[in-house]
């Protein structure tokens, strides 16, 4: 998960948006609002140890970081479940404006 988190930071930096990238981008989903597994960035905010190992059936929110320009911003998350073939996206919103 740390590799994915680092890749997201690299993309924002490459595109010139690093200063607007707020918060860690990945966290587990379950009974609590944000829960393990938490990669390094998110674990730091929660005072926990990072857990990078992905296991079958884990549900993750990816993209939680938010992009803020001035007073307003947007926060879009994709929810996925880890499968034996990679992942299955379970988010059902449209990606078009």
Predicted region positions:
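Active-site neighborhoods and metal-handling regions in enzymes and metal-associated proteins
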Residues: 1-97
């Amino acid at each position: 998960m740390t590799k994915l988190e680092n890749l997201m930071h690299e993309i924002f930096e490459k595109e010139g948006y690093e200063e607007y990238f707020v918060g860690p981008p990945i966290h587990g989903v379950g009974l609590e609002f944000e829960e393990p597994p938490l990669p390094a960035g998110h674990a730091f905010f929660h005072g926990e140890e990072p857990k990078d190992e992905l296991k079958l059936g884990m549900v993750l929110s990816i993209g939680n970081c938010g992009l803020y320009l001035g007073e307003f911003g947007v926060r879009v998350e994709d929810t996925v479940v880890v499968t034996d073939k990679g992942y299955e996206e379970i988010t059902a919103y449209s990606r078009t404006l």
